[in-house]
Amino acid sequence: MPVDPSLVGREFPAPAPLTVTQERVGAFAAAVGHPGGDVPPTFPIVLAFDAMQAFLDAEAIDLHRIVHGEQRFAYARPLAVGDELSATLTVTGLRQIGGADIIATASEITDATGAVVCTGKATLVHGGAA
């Protein structure tokens, strides 16, 4: 079943803020093979994924039917240990190609003051029901 086109423009916040800790950074760095030290530039995916999961859950879309097509980040400033971050995903586009839904999203990552730290754009390919 295709994804509802009225989703375009809807926002899905991550369920809770995330505090960037040295332990989280270390675990993420080890998982992705980053040498450690500063917060890896791909770390925002942790929070962006929480917002994406909120979208998938709200719309009853099975993560196992999603292929991650593209991901980009643009930074207003580097992330740092101690940052408390929140994320909101917005569905920015939707089209169907060959029976698949191509879902464009934008995630805004903000700090505790509400300042934008990072924005992410992703393309998700939804294969529909099995």
Question: Where are each of the predicted segments found?
Answer:
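Hot-dog-fold acyl-thioester-processing enzymes
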Residues: M1-E70
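HotDog/MaoC-like acyl-thioester-processing domains
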Residues: M1-V3, P78-A130
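Mid-chain, well-packed structural core segment of small domains
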Residues: D62-T88
